[in-house]
Amino acid sequence: MSAPAHKEPESFAFDAESEAKIATILKRYPEGKQASAVIPLLYVAQRQMGRLTQSAWVPRVAMDVIAARLSMPPIRVYEVATFYFMFNMKPIGRHHLQLCGTTPCMLRGSDDVLRACKDAGGVKGVGDTSADGLFTLTEVECLGACVNAPILQVDDDYYEDLDYDSTVKLLEAFKRGERPKPGSAIGRMASAPAGPQNVLTGQGDD
């Protein structure tokens, strides 16, 4: 890894809450195979940073701690952390806006969601953090919920079937300190059809 442009903490230690999660995670792996837990532990580290600093990211020193815990070379942890886009290698805003811009979401209006993120979230574009530190906007790969496109993942939650107005409403709620209920902005049940008919009635023409 190249030298970071931001300030890295000098030390990192998992707190009691994180240690309890790690103990549960490591029980899933047989002796000698604990290195397979690198992704879950990276996630635990990122969640701890978000909980304690209001910015969910993984400092290099945390990766070193994970490497020591799992008895693996630090470079192997760096490789995993930098490969997956869900791990943040630098500080981000309080809320992470993760916009899917792949084909289904693009065809269903992700550009309008992006415009709303700029207008209501105060970000200049993808990769930017708002001046108040509340939002960071990232464009991500497919989130796997294409039938509910367009999708905006905020932190760990999916907000689906969005348009410009519903995205503005969503971000305004976060600005007020609220946590809107995840799911469809149009009241769709799970991935059911968007129209009024969502069951097979057996009536009408074949």
Q: What are these language model-derived features?
A:
Residues 1-206:
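Signature of N-terminal electron-transfer/Fe-S-associated modules in redox systems
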